[in-house]
Amino acid sequence: MPKVSVIMTSYNKSDYVAKSISSILSQTFSDFELFIMDDNSNEETLNVIRPFLNDNRVRFYQSDISGVKERTEKTRYAALINQAIEMAEGEYITYATDDNIYMPDRLLKMVRELDTHPEKAVIYSASKTYHLNENRDIVKETVRPAAQVTWNAPCAIDHCSVMHRYSVLEKVKEKFGSYWDESPAFYRIGDARFFWRVNHFYPFYPLDEELDLNYITDQSIHFQLFELEKNEFVRNLPPQRNCRELRESLKKLGMG
């Protein structure tokens, strides 16, 4: 069985997905399986993905979902991640998106950290984000640090910077009935909602190195949500829950 299960979600990012997949398959640590969970992307994106399927570490799954209404009935990336978790065989679980780049030693360094520190169930690294305009020019650069142990991770950490033991998921599902929350009320902050669940049991331990790079583009769901574009997708979403709500509820529980 592989040591690590990497779960990548994908949807219509033909300009970026090849770089994302390549950054994972070229890791210095090779004992992993990669789930590419595609949400029925266009043919252009699928043509980019297909050459990578010859690698025996890759497991590709494509949904048959269609239509805006169906896409807003659940937080789609959470549903895809839950599907992958049910199939995952790794001792450790980590995440990626189709516009996220792993640094070459990301898996090696995070596996080493968990192997060396059995008391740590969840770790996270620092990460860099490039914000791109419609011409794909970098207009802003930000860094999320990894400086402290936290019992209040929602909206402070990106899920592409996290690795955790599979056993974390078992505790989460036992308490909440699922791994990631698929409610569309958390479309904006699906990873924050998952971290909220995890923080009921475990703190997040820092690994103070930049081990992944993210792109925020006009193709991303988060761009659409944060810019509040009045498109059909946004109009069909229910009112969105927020970071403050999650963080305050953890504080009331004595977490952070």
UniProtKB/Swiss-Prot annotation:
Record bears the keyword Acyltransferase: no
Keyword Nuclease set for record: no
- All disulfide bonds of the chain are C155-C243
**Could you tell me the keywords of this UniProt record?**
Disulfide bond, Glycosyltransferase, Transferase
Pathway the protein takes part in: Spore coat biogenesis; spore coat polysaccharide biosynthesis
Q: Name one Pfam family in it.
A: Glycos_transf_2
Q: How does it assemble?
A: Monomer in solution.
Signal peptide positions on this chain: none
Please provide, alphabetically and separated by semicolons, the GO molecular function terms listed in this UniProt record.
Answer: glycosyltransferase activity
Cited PANTHER family:
GLYCOSYLTRANSFERASE (PTHR43685), GLYCOSYLTRANSFERASE 2-LIKE DOMAIN-CONTAINING PROTEIN (PTHR43685:SF2)
| Notes concerning its domains | Contains an N-terminal nucleotide-binding domain and a C-terminal acceptor-binding domain.
Active-site residues from the entry: D191
Q: What does this protein do?
A: Glycosyltransferase implicated in the synthesis of the spore coat.
The UniProt entry's sequence similarity note says: Belongs to the glycosyltransferase 2 family.
The protein's name is: Spore coat polysaccharide biosynthesis protein SpsA
